[in-house]
Regions:
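Extracellular polysaccharide-degrading/modifying enzymes targeting complex plant/algal/animal polysaccharides
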Residues: 27-151, 157, 179-194, 204-208, ...
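Sec/Tat signal peptide C-region and signal peptidase I cleavage site
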Residues: 21-25
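Extracellular and organelle-lumenal recognition/adhesion modules and their flexible linkers in secreted
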Residues: 130-292
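Residues within well-ordered beta-strands of beta-sheet-rich folds
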Residues: 63-67, 89-91, 142, 204-212, ...
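A recurrent domain-boundary module in secreted/ectodomain proteins
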Residues: 286-288, 643-655
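Bacterial N-terminal signal peptides
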Residues: 10-20
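Glycine- and acidic/polar-rich repeat regions and solenoidal domains
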Residues: 274, 356-361, 376-386, 399-587, ...
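Bacterial N-terminal signal peptides that target proteins for export
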Residues: 1-12
């Protein structure tokens, strides 16, 4: 145990000190009544928009505070702090409820909806005949006769041969050919680009392109940037991800949000390190279009009606719309269609169309703290992005998250987590947060593909209810590593009881969902948690070898699932009544209890422990390993002879 203590103290101190002020730091304020022309340096000089927050350069130690009681729609793209300069904090100021970051488009005005026949109503979009008529901002997009207007660049030992080739996608006259002889090691080592177009701050832009290659690979997403030094990014992609390229022509689409007004835009394909040597890439029909204000630029993954619990039901074809509140997103026309007996906005006072974007996109970010923010109605992740470290998520709310179409096209896979750390991740803390109605997992770290190290990640003192999974984990391949993971003192209620369960192709409902994970694993702690009721399994790891299950450190948890298989591990199912057999097989949880936790009022979302609860003083004194000074509400721990199980600590007289 002493070896754990030395390693873990550093992790927790990161969490405790992450948001401490720095003497030279600046604090910026944001309010609905502010103006982006203001300095932002006082409540009286507050900024107004997320666009300004995302665009303004911040320094390590700075803080951006949103006014309580106000709301913003769109995506927060944080900036990174540094180890020496401190974290950049995104938090709240003033009195009232937490500031809202909404990942949705409101369609609650009857004028938002147009009758489309057969009890169908449409919102957003353009007429199908107009889609192809949107102006293409790029010159020579199809390479019909030559490659004029396009250039290439190679450095860092990379080498490519670029030229036009007759015959492109679907019989078009031509395409561009980029044959790689040496790939280089950094994305900018190979570039293919065009320039000379304008972008407008706050505008939405859609990029489409047809691609194929002589051998499969994953292409980095293109960037929209300044044509010269200092090569500033003019637009941020919404949910950037690598694009799979195969031998067959395929059309890929990306959406960008512009953060600058500029007339010297450059579309840059960065291929160094991803286009393998000996592979030839072909591009055709490259279009960059400014989307109109009325369009819904990304998939609608959920429609929240009157703020829940009722939600729309997603279907994948217009022809399937035949029941009240079913909806379909028209990917080509940027519109949503709803089946309704009457105008939807006359039937419901509030209609929130959750768009497939992370509400907070922290791709490649580090030394960032999010505190006292409410992230609602987003159809991707609440907080998402890969390759992160030194991230703190504290005192935040995440509700009605996920459900968006992950890939688009014919690959109809829905996804969405509350807080996700994807790929390499370390020194991250999620504490005192609330999660409800999440399509996939409330909290997760996961990885697949490249080698990833995931370590020093802590989830503590959180409340979770009505999420498909409370906590999900997997890491692949076997050369990846996972160690020093702590899931402790969380209260997890009713897994699989949320809006998304019945809409899933794989209804699950699990508190702990551990898929196949061959990564090297050690020091994985699951302690002092309440796991109450799950539609299927409170603990699910059927594909894990028994030795991998035994490597977990699990104890002092409270389990209750009245029906069905409560634990499914290593191809062994156990009901609640068979908990002793599970304990004997694995050697885990000698001090865990199997009983109703005795919560105050679950219907009212009051998850405090009642007097006489078996969870009081039944936790492990993890203070021997790390300082956990307080519970979800700040009550000092412990109040009695030992810590309580769950996120709440009862008064000393509670037992």
């Amino acid at each position: 145990m002493p070896s754990h203590r030395v390693r873990f103290l550093g992790v927790i101190m990161v969490g405790l000190l992450a948001c401490a002020p720095v003497a030279v730091a600046a604090t910026y304020y944001v309010a609905n009544a502010g103006s982006d022309d203001n300095s932002g340096l006082s409540p009286q000089e507050a900024w107004a928009s997320l666009t300004q927050v995302n665009a303004h350069p911040l320094a390590p130690g700075d803080a951006v505070l949103f006014k309580r009681g106000d709301a913003w729609r769109g995506q927060l793209v944080p900036q990174s702090g540094s180890e020496g300069g401190g974290y950049i904090t995104y938090g709240a100021y003033g009195e009232g409820p937490k500031p809202l970051l909404l990942g949705s488009i409101a369609k609650d005005n009857p004028d938002d909806w147009a009758a489309a026949g057969d009890k169908l109503w449409s919102a957003g979009g353009v007429a199908p005949a107009d889609v192809s008529g949107i102006e293409n901002l790029l010159v020579n997009p199809g390479f019909d006769t030559d490659a004029q207007g396009w250039s290439s660049h190679a450095e860092g030992g990379a080498k490519v041969a670029v030229g036009r080739e007759a015959g492109g996608v679907e019989g078009s006259p031509g395409a561009i050919r980029i044959a790689c002889e040496a790939s280089g090691s950094e994305p900018h080592h190979i570039q293919f680009y065009t320039s000379g177009f304008a972008v407008e701050r706050g505008g939405m832009y859609r990029l489409t392109m047809a691609v194929r290659a002589s051998a499969p690979f994953e292409m980095y997403p293109p960037v929209i940037m300044k044509s010269g030094a200092p090569w500033t990014r003019y637009a941020h992609p919404r949910n950037p991800h690598n694009m799979p390229v195969t031998a067959e022509w395929a059309v890929h689409t990306m959406t960008f949000g512009a953060v600058e007004d500029a007339g010297d835009g450059r579309l840059n394909f960065v291929l160094g390190g991803c286009l393998p040597a000996g592979v030839t890439l072909y591009l055709d029909n490259i279009r960059l279009e400014r989307l109109g204000a009325g369009l819904i630029p990304r998939d609608v993954g959920n429609i929240i009606l009157n703020h829940g619990p009722r939600c729309g039901v997603k279907v994948w074809n217009r022809e399937d719309l035949d029941q009240q509140d079913e909806y379909w997103y028209d990917e080509a026309g940027f519109a949503v269609y709803v089946y309704s007996e009457t105008n939807p906005a006359e039937r419901y006072e509030s209609i929130e169309c959750a768009v497939r974007d992370h509400i907070i996109n922290q791709q490649n970010r580090h030394h960032v703290c999010y505190e006292n923010l409410a992230c609602l109605y987003g159809a991707a992740h609440g907080v998402g992005g890969g390759s992160t470290h030194h991230i703190v998520v504290r005192g935040c709310d995440f509700g009605y998250i996920g459900g968006g179409d992950q890939m688009g096209g014919d690959r109809t896979v829905r996804f969405g987590n509350g807080v996700e750390f994807w790929g390499p991740a370390h020194d991250c803390l999620v504490e005192r947060c609330r999660f409800w109605e999440v399509y996939d997992a409330a909290m997760t770290h996961q990885s697949s593909g490249g080698v990833a190290a995931q370590y020093n990640i802590v989830y503590q003192n959180n409340l979770v209810w009505n999420c498909e999974y409370s906590f999900e984990y997997w890491n692949r391949p076997e050369t990846s590593t996972t160690h020093h993971i702590w899931f402790i003192n969380n209260t997890c209620i009713n897994a699989g009881h949320g809006w998304g369960h019945a809409q899933r192709p794989d209804p699950s409902g699990r508190h702990l969902c551990f898929y196949t994970s061959p990564a090297q694993q050690s020091e994985f702690y699951i302690l002092n948690n309440v796991f109450y009721e799950a539609k299927k399994n409170a603990f699910y790891a059927p594909s894990w070898p028994l030795e991998q299950v035994k490597s977990l450190v699990m104890d002092h948890n409270c389990w209750y699932q009245a029906e069905g298989t409560m634990v499914a591990v290593s191809e062994h199912p156990f009901t609640m009544a068979e908990f002793a057999a599970y304990r004997a097989l694995t050697g885990l949880e000698p001090h865990s209890i199997v009983a109703a936790p005795g919560l105050a009022n679950m219907d009212a979302l009051d998850f405090r422990l009642t007097p006489g609860s078996p969870c009081i003083d039944a936790g492990w004194a993890v203070e021997a390993l790390y300082p956990r000074p307080a519970d979800f509400t700040g009550v000092p721990v412990p109040q009695g002879n030992a810590p309580d199980i769950g996120a709440y600590e009862s008064p000393a007289s509670g037992k």
